[in-house]
Amino acid sequence: MESRLVWNDRYSVGVNIIDKEHKKLFRILNKLFEFGDLETKRPWVCQETVKYFKDHAIRHFQDEEEYMASIRHIGLKMHRRIHKNFRDTTLPALEKEMEDKNYSEESVNHFLGVCAGWLIGHTLIEDQAIVSGEEIKQWENLLPEEEQAVMGQAIVNQLHTMFRLETKMISNCYGGEKFGDGIYYRLVYSTREKKRWEFILVLEERLIINTIGSVLDMKSKAIDVLVMNAARYTSRQFVEYIKSFFPALAEADVKDEQLLTYEQFEKVFEKHSPQYSLLFDTGEGYFAYCMATIDELPDKESGNSIMTENAMAKVEKYLAQNREKKAAAENRKKVLIVDDSNFMLTLMKDLLKNDYEVQTATSGLSAIRSIALGRPDLVLLDYEMPVCKGDQILEMIRADADFADISVVFLTGKADKESVKKVLEFKPDGYLSKALEPEAIKREIDRFFERKK
C-alpha cells in the first residue's frame, strides 16, 4: 500500500495526554498499512493490530472525556456521543467485515480508510475545539442573511483549521452548477420526532487529493477506495461540527449516507430547496455546502445508499462510474444552455446529451457562475430571458477578458426579419429559432462545431 498517515505538529492540541495518544493511533494505523502488504501474515497480524488500535482508541476516549470534564468543556456531551458511535457501531461493523472476509486486502483497506478518515476528522475538527477557547454559539435567533454569513465564515475558519486553506466564499446562493470532476456526498439525519435534514457536500476531486490525500501521503493523483473512505468519514465529522450549531439537530442521527452522480445530485437539489447553499473557492479546488429540511427519508433501494454491508463494493462502483464518465467526456464539447423554461432546458438537454457535455442554467447569475466554474465551448442563450435579458448576459460575458472568446448563440422564439435584425445587432456568434424542429437545431449545432475545426 502506498498510503500512510503523516503526523503534522499542527495537529497537536497542547494537552500532553491527548497529543500522545493521537500520535500513537497514527503509528498503529501506519503499522496496518505496512502489514496489509504481507499476504502470508495478514490475518493474524492485522487481527492483533486492530485489537491494539481499538484498545488504545477506547482508552483515549476515556482520557479525553475525563480531561474535558475536568475543565467543564461545553462540548463534552457531543464528544461522548461521537465516541460512542465510533466505539459501539463503526468499529464492530468493520471488525465483523474483516473477520467474515478473513482479513482480505479489500476489507483491511476499508477498515484503514474509515479509521483514517475518522482519525483525521477527530484530530483536526473535534479535538482542536477542546483547546480553541471558542464556544459554539447556536444560530437559532439570527436573521437569514446573518445566518448565511456566519455559516460561511464558520466553514472558512474550519477549513483553515483543518488544512490551512485560504478559503473564500464566492456565492451564498449556489445553484447546483457543475464544477470540475466532483464528488457528491449526501448525509440524511432524522430525530425521534421524524424531523429530517439533508446535508450535501460537493467536493472537487483535486480538493480531496490535495487535503485528505496529503495527510495520507498518497502518491497517485486519482482517488481510490481507501482515500474515498477517508474522505467520507472526514466529511461526516465536518457535518457533525456544523450540525452542533443547531439546537434542533442535537439529537439527530444519521439515517442514510449516499454518493451521488451529478445527475442524481441535480434531481435531489431541485426537489429540496436548500436553506443553505454556499460555494467556496479553497485555492485547492471548489467546495459547496448545501443543507435542507426534507419530508421523507430517501429510498434505500434506489441504489445510492452506502450504509450497507457491501459499502466497499458500492464505493468502488461509484469511483469506476466516475472514471468512465470522465474518460467519455474528455473529447466531448461542452455546451451550456441558458433558458428560464424548464421545458426548453429538458428538451435541449435530451437533444444534445448523447454527443455533448451539457450544462444548464435558468438565469443570468447562474449562467455566469456556470461559465466561471466550468468553461463551455458554446453557450446557447435564450434571447427573451426575463429580468436579465439575453443581450445583457451576452454583454457580461463579453466584458470579462477570460470569457470574451466563448462562442454564444442566441435562441429566439421570434423568427421575423425585424426581430432577427435586432438580435444580430448584439453580434452573437449566431442565432437559432426555437420554432425549428429539434433535429434541425441539432444539425445546426453540429455544423457550428464542424466549422470551428
Place the predicted regions along the sequence by residue:
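Conserved acidic segment of CheY-like receiver
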Residues: N331-N342, M348, V379
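Acidic, metal-coordinating helix/loop segments flanking the phosphotransfer/catalytic sites
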Residues: T362-L378
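A Lys-centered signature of the CheY-like receiver
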Residues: K434
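Receiver (REC) domain active-site loop signature in two-component systems and cognate sites
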Residues: M385
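Two-component/phosphorelay signaling modules centered on CheY-like receiver
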Residues: N342-Q359, L373
